[in-house]
Amino acid sequence: MPKPFYVKFEVPPELADKVYQAISKVRETGGKIKKGTNETTKAVERGQAKLVVIAEDVDPPEIVAHLPLLCDEKKIPYVYVPSKQKLGQAAGIEVSAASVAVIDVGGAKDLIDEIIKSVQQIRAQSG
């Protein structure tokens, strides 16, 4: 199945798994995340987000299509994950999450920094 139009670069499965782990770790170590596209959008617009995670299986895709552009504009790193269901679980909610924003990394700083670095390398290679 082709990726939705808002997916600007390919994220390897092992990196996506690391992202889910990082979101869980942020939540479990006193960090702060915003769940859902409205909350994520506000966090990006206010410049509070350290990392934005966007699910690839959002329907309709227009729900999150503005996030990559907004993140680029605000110079906030973002990454894609394949499953909104898994993203919701990692964020500690019972329902799926189209996107989440990390506001405070808590005890997951190393993991978050590693993810941001990997994303920068992927984006540099994919032009």
From Swiss-Prot:
Q: Which InterPro entries match?
A: eL8/uL1-like (IPR050257), Ribosomal_eL30-like_sf (IPR029064), Ribosomal_eL8-like_CS (IPR004037), Ribosomal_eL8/eL30/eS12/Gad45 (IPR004038), Ribosomal_eL8/Nhp2 (IPR018492), Ribosomal_eL8_arc (IPR022481)
Would you name any one GO CC term? Answer: ribosome
Q: Where in the cell is it found?
A: Cytoplasm
Output one GO BP term: translation
Q: Which residues form a coiled coil?
A: none
> Where is the major localization of this protein?
cytoplasm
Transmembrane in keyword set: no
Q: Which domain of life is it from?
A: Archaea
Q: Which Pfam families match?
A: Ribosomal_L7Ae
Q: Name one GO molecular function term.
A: rRNA binding
**Which Gene3D superfamilies does the entry link to?**
3.30.1330.30
The transmembrane segments are none
Keyword vocabulary terms for this entry? Cytoplasm, Ribonucleoprotein, Ribosomal protein, RNA-binding, rRNA-binding, tRNA processing
Q: What does this protein do?
A: Multifunctional RNA-binding protein that recognizes the K-turn motif in ribosomal RNA, the RNA component of RNase P, box H/ACA, box C/D and box C'/D' sRNAs.
What family does the database annotate?
Answer: Belongs to the eukaryotic ribosomal protein eL8 family.
Partners and quaternary state? Answer: Part of the 50S ribosomal subunit. Probably part of the RNase P complex.
Show the PANTHER family listed in the entry. Answer: RIBOSOMAL PROTEIN L7AE FAMILY MEMBER
What NCBIfam families does the database record attribute to this sequence? Answer: eL8_ribo
What name does this protein carry? Answer: Large ribosomal subunit protein eL8
- The record's gene field reads rpl7ae
